[in-house]
Design a protein with these regions (language model features):
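Periodic aromatic/glycine/histidine/acidic cluster detector
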Residues: 37-45
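Short aromatic-glycine-(Arg/Gly/Cys) micro-motifs in beta-strand/loop hairpins
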Residues: 44-71
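Intrinsically disordered, low-complexity segments enriched in small/polar residues
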Residues: 24, 33, 51, 67-68, ...
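Negatively charged, low-complexity tracts enriched in Asp/Glu with abundant Ser/Thr
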Residues: 1-38
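Mixed-charge, Lys/Arg-enriched low-complexity segments
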Residues: 3-10, 62-106
């Protein structure tokens, strides 16, 4: 647990705009998926308005008829909700006709 708060760090170092902590990395095996496992990195964002969590997938997906690749990264209140959001966002576009790309420097 970090004892120093974001405000303490920002007072010391004015160039800090955001602090993130990696909460966990989850690997999800998906049947018949060439790029399996789907990996989700859940980070906690520490800021003055309260902590939030974001799930970040190592894969982006382009569904049939979509113009671009997608991965859900909406701030959530809990790490479980962040994991759910990232996985749900991936499966929302997954089909036999989807295109998938691995994210470099994930």
């Amino acid at each position: 647990m970090i004892e120093m708060t974001e405000t303490d760090l920002q007072r010391k170092h004015t160039g800090i705009s955001e602090i993130r902590e990696i909460v966990g990395i989850y690997e999800i095996d998906i049947e018949d998926l060439k790029y399996s496992p789907l990996k989700i990195k859940v980070i906690q964002i520490l800021n003055a308005s309260g902590d939030s969590y974001i799930g970040i997938a190592n894969l982006t997906i382009k569904g049939k008829g979509c113009s671009g690749y997608y991965r859900s990264m909406h701030p959530q209140k809990t790490k479980e909700e962040a994991l759910d959001d990232a996985v749900d966002g991936f499966f929302a576009y997954l089909s036999d006709e989807s295109e998938i790309k691995v994210v470099k420097n994930w």
